[in-house]
Curated annotation (Swiss-Prot):
Subcellular location: Cytoplasm; Golgi apparatus membrane
Membrane topology summary: Peripheral membrane protein
HEAT-type repeats, residues: 33-70, 107-142, 143-179, 180-216, 218-254, 292-329, 330-366
Modified residues (N-acetylserine): S2
Record's keyword annotation contains Nucleus: no
Entry keyword set: Acetylation, Cytoplasm, Golgi apparatus, Membrane, Protein transport, Repeat, Transport
Task of the protein: Part of the AP-3 complex, an adaptor-related complex which seems to be clathrin-associated. The complex is associated with the Golgi region as well as more peripheral structures. It facilitates the budding of vesicles from the Golgi membrane and may be directly involved in trafficking to the vacuole. It also function in maintaining the identity of lytic vacuoles and in regulating the transition between storage and lytic vacuoles.
PANTHER family: AP-3 COMPLEX SUBUNIT DELTA-1, DELTA ADAPTIN-RELATED
Name of one Pfam family that matches: Adaptin_N
Region (Disordered): 738-869
Predominant location: cytoplasm
Protein's name in the database: AP-3 complex subunit delta
SUPFAM superfamilies reported for this sequence: ARM repeat
């Protein structure tokens, strides 16, 4: 009595879902605190024995889980209890909670099997509906296997409300339990002949999903689908049938010829835009070889494009993008409308128009379309502006710049892109500047000019997104300095004070490029001092006319400028900048004194000429493009064993792997001590090189012999390190003039020039495909099994259908009878062969697995429907 009174009191004072929502809107505790208190209250209420109290608590928990992501997996057993209630209101709340929270790993999943079976057999159609909806959402292999008989029964229900939901749940049952196809598929196909539009819509929807997964398995049902296409007047049913035929026509060309006329008829007569668009999409994607149908579809697309509704306009552009690969003339006919759509307010319309413009690009119109797009990029928002830039870059660089004839024009276009205010595609432009330099020799003079104009543009230094472009420009200026008209101005641009705005990694590239320029200028100067080789040196490089223009004063001035600019960087905080700066300053310290004293530089044995000649050799090797798959082609050397587990490091390193004691010296002290010991040892070895080797040397040699695979090659690189900012004045005032000439947006490509040679790789330049397909292997295997089951069911159905047809109609044509007898003879012969094989193989294996039987039956020839012949 006490427990009963307690449950009544709990139910009386329990807050309903409506009270919870009102309290949530008026709460002052904060959202998280209120939800925590509500969940604690629900945990207490859901333990009540009264199902009304329990169901109300479960209802509130479902609300919190749906809107606020509260975990409700802990209430799984309580949901099973509520479902078992005889009241429909409680049952509905329980099924909702199960649908919302159950998954394949739910521990109490098996407890609902009998309850779902009971509800599927209920006389109340609404309870049956709840069970079917739940099964369609959480159905597992076990549930599908155990409930297949009930689903089969409901497929023949006289209640339309129940039958359409049973048809919908069949798809989930087929996916989870493939043997259900043998039981339910025939009855599912029979529903294609129903006159009830709701049931027909449901069954066509199921076959639409099956055809998407595997069109081949649905091909024998083409006559039934064709009948629906011709007879149905329900637009949504027709749309689904069109989706089915769009898949089937791709694998059976004769089917396209058969369905083209009914589809065109629907396009002519219907006023429903949704049906017209689906007809258009079916024609342009699957019936593109039918010229009359394509022309009608393009005319309908034109009607979509001129609509004021942005949704219809987008659909028209989307249809044009589908038809573009095979019928580019359709896009060219609507070019003006597509260009006009670039200024539409809807971002989706603009994006689709951009994709269409890029589909039209070829070597004849790339300049015109690029000019149009650059104008739109200047006045577009940052997001769409960068989408335009990326599209142009992708189209122009496709297949090693196959549509670019005039690379001087294209490099100027890249410079123009860099100056667009919203440009954030610095890395893409950087890649193309370097890539063109490595691939196209004839483009290097213009590349150097564009790079110099980029370096002296002060606006680019303050934009973080454009720093990669400046990095590429600096590298190009140093790598191809022989094409520079004035190396002195290049050095000024590389060492200008505003380069302090750049990150250290790019600043290091600036310094290294200045080093390359200095080496080139000194090399040219020394070459010009040699009387026997001065004329030869002038002709050695077709791109450089600067061999004889360097004088003693200009070289000395250049050295002083670089020394002045890099001096402060010898104490720079970044180690790479510091190291590169000290490398250059060390080189200058070697050659400056000889140049300043005007020694006889005609003597090849001077220290300056020797060092310069060596550095020229270092920088003389040209870089070329490298395939993205080059690393994969490197063969592992014979005898090399890379152990996955480096467990033997303890044996090799010994005591060095022991943990450091807490009272030992610090890590920094150890490093300093080790470095000082190494220096002392080097000095001792230098002073006593003739003395006998120490015992440690022999031990080291023995250790290296035993564990040589863990040693690097012994090559010493003695380099200094340092760096910081420069206060050298800006480049000369002619920079703006020259940069404007380089980035003239009205400049057109010179079509009369022959296309320069572009270096291509033998295995292509495409990037390696990411292994995303591996994640879909299990899904593909499941779809394959389902496909085999459907094909087996269709073969059985077709055999019975053909037999009934020819036996029941003695007046059938002679050709059909011959075809039928041929198929039966073929099947009988196949059966005889299988029996013989089975007798021969009885000694080794007496039984064939069920999967092998399915594969054998699915591999039989699919009968092509007669209406295609």
């Amino acid at each position: 009595m006490s427990s009963s009174s307690t449950s009544i009191m709990d139910n009386l004072f329990q807050r309903s879902l409506e009270d919870l929502i009102k309290g949530f809107r008026l709460q002052l505790l904060g959202e998280s605190n209120f939800i925590s208190r509500a969940v604690e209250e629900i945990r207490r209420e859901i333990k009540a024995t009264d199902l009304s109290t329990k169901s109300t608590a479960l209802h509130k928990l479902s609300y919190l889980a749906a809107l606020h992501g509260v975990d409700m997996s802990w209430a799984a057993f309580h949901a099973v209890e509520v479902v078992s209630s005889s009241r429909f209101q409680h049952k509905r709340i329980g099924y909702q909670a199960i649908t919302q929270s159950f998954n394949d790993q739910t521990s109490v999943m098996l407890l609902i099997t009998n309850q779902v079976r009971k509800d599927l057999n209920s006389a109340n159609e609404y309870e049956v509906s709840l069970a079917l909806e739940c099964l369609s959402r959480i159905g597992t292999h076990d549930l599908a296997r155990d409930l297949t008989p009930e689903v089969f029964t409901l497929l023949g229900s006289s209640k339309s409300f129940v039958k359409k939901k049973a048809i919908g749940v069949v798809l989930r049952v087929f996916e989870k339990y493939h043997d259900a196809v043998k039981v339910c598929f025939k009855r599912l196909v029979e529903n294609l002949e129903t006159s009830d539009p709701q049931i027909l819509s449901a069954v066509v929807g199921v076959f639409c999903e099956l055809a998407t997964k595997d069109p081949q398995s649905c091909l024998p049902l083409a006559p039934e689908f064709y009948k629906v296409l011709v007879d149905s007047r329900n637009n949504w049913v027709l749309i689904k049938v069109l989706k089915i035929f769009a898949k089937l026509a791709l694998i059976e060309p004769r089917l396209g010829k058969k369905v083209a006329e009914p589809i065109c008829e629907h396009m002519r007569r219907t006023v429903a835009k949704s049906l017209v668009f689906e007809c258009v999409r079916t024609v342009v994607s699957s019936l593109s070889d039918n010229e009359a149908a394509v022309k009608l579809a393009v005319a309908k697309i034109r009607e979509f494009l001129v609509e004021d509704d942005p949704n219809l306009k987008y659909l028209g552009l989307n249809a044009l993008s589908i038809v573009a690969p095979k019928h580019l003339w359709a896009v060219l006919e609507n070019k003006e409308v597509v260009v006009k759509a670039m200024s539409d307010e809807d971002p989706n319309v603009k994006l689709e128009a951009l994709h269409l413009l890029m589909a039209m690009v070829n070597e004849d119109n790339v300049s015109e379309i690029s000019r149009i797009l650059m104008n739109y990029a200047l006045k577009s928002d940052p997001l769409f502006c960068n989408e335009i830039i990326f599209s142009v870059l992708s189209a122009c660089s496709r297949n090693a710049y196959e549509i670019i004839v005039d690379f001087d024009w294209y490099l100027s276009l890249l410079g123009e892109m860099a100056r667009i205010p919203h440009c954030q595609r610095g890395e893409d432009i950087e890649h193309q500047l370097i890539d063109i330099g490595m691939r196209v020799r004839d483009a290097r003079p213009q590349l150097v000019r564009v790079s110099w104009a980029l370096l002296i543009d002060p606006a680019l230094l303050g934009n973080l997104f454009l720093h990669p472009i400046l990095s590429a420009a600096a590298w190009v200026s140093g790598e191809y300095v022989e094409f520079s008209k004035n190396p002195y101005e290049t050095v000024e641009a590389l060492l200008q004070p505003r380069t302090d705005l750049l990150p250290p990694s790019i600043k290091a590239i600036y310094i290294h490029s200045a080093f390359k320029v200095l080496v080139f200028c000194l090399g040219s100067y020394f070459s010009s001092q040699e009387p026997t080789s001065s004329s030869l040196a002038q002709e050695s490089s077709s791109g450089s006319l600067l061999v004889n223009v360097f004088t003693h004063e200009s070289i000395l001035s250049l050295v002083n400028v670089i020394e002045l600019g890099l001096g402060p960087l010898s104490g720079y905080h970044d180690v790479e900048v510091q190291e590169r700066a000290k490398n250059v300053l060390g080189y200058i310290s070697v050659i400056k004194q000889e140049i300043a004293e005007q020694l006889n530089l005609q003597d090849n044995e001077t220290e300056a000429s020797r060092v310069t000649a060596f550095m020229e050799d270092v920088f003389s090797e040209e870089f070329g493009p490298i395939s993205a798959t080059a690393q994969e082609k490197v063969c592992v050397p014979d005898g090399l064993e890379l152990k996955e587990n480096l467990g033997d490091l303890e044996e090799i390193c010994g005591e060095h792997l022991k943990p450091v004691e807490s009272d030992s010296v610090s890590y920094t002290d150890k490093i300093s001590f080790s470095v000082s010991k190494l220096r002392i040892r080097d000095q001792q070895e230098a002073t006593s090189s003739s003395s006998p080797p120490h015992e440690a040397s022999s031990l080291l040699a023995e250790h290296r012999k035993r564990h040589g695979m863990y040693y690097l090659t012994s090559q010493k690189e003695d380099q200094d390190s340092n760096g910081t900012s420069s206060d050298y004045p800006l480049a000369n005032e002619l920079a703006n003039e020259i940069s404007q000439d380089s980035f003239n947006p009205k400049r057109k490509p010179n079509q009369s020039k022959p296309r320069p040679v572009v270096v291509k790789l033998d295995d292509g330049d495409e990037s390696r495909i990411t292994p995303q397909a591996k994640t879909n292997i299990q899904t593909a295997n499941d779809d394959e099994s389902l496909s085999r089951a459907i094909q087996s069911a269709l073969l059985v159905k077709n055999k019975g259908k053909e037999k009934d047809r020819y036996e029941g109609n003695p007046n059938s044509g002679q050709q059909e009878k011959e075809e039928s007898s041929r198929i039966e003879n073929h099947q009988n012969s196949e059966k005889k062969k299988k029996k013989k094989k089975k007798k021969k193989g009885e000694g080794s294996s007496k039984h064939k697995s069920r999967r092998q039987n399915e594969v054998a039956s699915a591999s039989e020839q699919v009968i092509i429907p007669d209406f295609l012949l």
